């Protein structure tokens, strides 16, 4: 029984050390806005009272003595305890690495992508599976905007050799699942190829849809033209300058329904498009006027349009109808947008006050391209996406962090980094 108790205490001590050392570690501290602020307040010292408010640590223990005893057993020498035993800090002898090209390259070579976890898997289960696979600096569980685990993670090993050794094992399984394991560079190269392929497919699909739409438009136009063969009647002569389309409607109102009239006031000729055979409408109108069909008291030459001339005239009329429809549609869209002068409104009702509701946050996400991490600070859980906070003036212990980027950015831009406030689901 005593041995079991000792083992449980040892396991707890290990978990406490790992969790706190993660908070102050190379990966998290530069990205943790809240903890960076705390570090600046007292020469790097952070009260244990503050630390136990962090979610994952508080689940392990909130007892100061247990935390201190665990940290004393750590062999990393990353953390220091103050004389009063109420505060801890990252040792000044172990400053954060400088964010230069060497560090970025090292980060890339230490990073590994793994896919194949069931989406119900939690961080503790992943950490347990990775226990015997080398020291790991960070585990990033990739999630959707809806906070659903995608089944894939990015690991950052402590060393390049650790990552290389992990990549050499191509037969890794999680429970019964075969795992897809890629280096970070391989992953981004694969995503780039997929994007190129998708772009090519989308382009081909767009071209096909455009061609189909064009064909449908041509078929519709051809059908429309066929339905209107024999429906055009041209009129010309010394027309009265006040002749209007209304005069033509009046002239044929009981003899043939008119669909469209291509005519402007003052012109000497025009074309009438009937919804029926134009010859029938003309014959009826002539018969009703003793074969002397005049327009506003003026003699008119009436001609049926046929052949190529008919096709050209129909095409022109169809285009005119469409243009008129588009203009009318545009006017209707603006019809009720304003009142009075300048469209500002002249009604007497009081204007509604719009309450400012804060800055709107938008997230870019796609199923495989973007990640979002939930991060937690004491007393408050927030969601952060595509945000990076650089070091504040005088912050010797917090170098700037790489910018977080979506996976559709260039692979060589560096590691995907979130501005987090510490843990909740991702370490």
From Swiss-Prot:
PROSITE patterns to which the protein is assigned, alphabetical: HTH_LA (PS50961), RRM (PS50102), XRRM (PS51939)
Alphabetized Gene3D superfamilies for the sequence: 3.30.70.330, Winged helix-like DNA-binding domain superfamily/Winged helix DNA-binding domain
UniProt motif (Nuclear localization signal) ranges: 315-331
Stretches with biased composition (Basic and acidic residues): 405-427
GO CC annotations, alphabetized: cytoplasmic stress granule; cytosol; nucleus; ribonucleoprotein complex
The keyword RNA-binding belongs to this UniProt entry's keyword annotation: yes
Domain xRRM: 226-348
Gene Ontology MF terms in the entry: mRNA binding
More info: There are two forms of La, LaA and LaB, in Xenopus.
Protein's recorded name: Lupus La protein homolog B
């Amino acid at each position: 029984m005593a041995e079991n108790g000792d083992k449980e205490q040892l396991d707890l001590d290990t978990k406490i050390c790992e969790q706190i050392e993660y908070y102050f570690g190379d990966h998290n501290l530069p990205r943790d806005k809240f903890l960076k602020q705390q570090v600046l307040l007292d020469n790097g010292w952070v009260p244990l009272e503050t630390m136990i408010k962090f979610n994952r640590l508080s689940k392990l223990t909130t007892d100061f003595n247990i935390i201190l005893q665990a940290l004393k057993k750590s062999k990393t020498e990353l953390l220091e305890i103050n004389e009063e035993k109420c505060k801890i800090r990252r040792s000044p002898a172990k400053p954060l690495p400088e964010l230069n090209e060497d560090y970025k390259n090292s980060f890339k070579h230490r990073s590994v992508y793994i896919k194949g976890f069931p989406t119900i898997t939690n961080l503790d289960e992943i950490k347990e599976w990775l226990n015997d696979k080398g020291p790991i600096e960070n585990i990033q569980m990739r999630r959707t905007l809806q906070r659903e685990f995608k089944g894939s993670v990015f690991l950052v090993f402590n060393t390049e050799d650790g990552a290389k050794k992990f990549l050499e094992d191509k037969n890794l399984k999680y429970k019964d699942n075969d795992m897809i394991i890629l280096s970070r560079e391989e992953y981004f190269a694969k995503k780039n190829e997929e994007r190129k392929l998708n772009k090519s497919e989308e382009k081909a699909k767009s071209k096909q849809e455009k061609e189909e739409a064009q064909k449908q438009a041509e078929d519709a136009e051809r059908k429309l033209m066929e339905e209107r063969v024999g429906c055009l009647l041209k009129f010309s002569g010394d027309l009265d300058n006040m002749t209007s389309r209304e005069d033509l409607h009046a002239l044929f109102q009981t003899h043939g329904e008119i669909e469209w009239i291509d005519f402007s006031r003052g012109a000497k000729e025009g074309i009438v498009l009937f919804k029926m055979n134009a010859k029938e409408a003309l014959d009826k109108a002539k018969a009703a006027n003793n074969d002397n069909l005049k327009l506003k008291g003026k003699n008119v030459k009436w001609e049926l349009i046929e052949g190529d001339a008919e096709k050209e005239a129909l095409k022109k009329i169809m285009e005119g109808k469409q243009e008129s429809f588009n203009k009318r549609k545009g006017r209707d869209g603006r019809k009720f947008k304003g009142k009075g002068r300048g469209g500002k409104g002249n009604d007497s009702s009081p204007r509604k006050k719009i309450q400012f509701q804060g800055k709107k946050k938008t997230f870019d996400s796609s199923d495989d391209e973007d990640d979002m991490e939930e991060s937690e600070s004491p007393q408050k859980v927030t969601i952060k996406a595509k945000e990076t906070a650089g070091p504040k003036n005088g912050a010797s212990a917090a170098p700037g962090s790489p910018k977080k980027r979506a996976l559709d950015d260039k692979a060589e831009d560096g590691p995907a980094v979130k501005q987090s406030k510490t843990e909740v689901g991702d370490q």
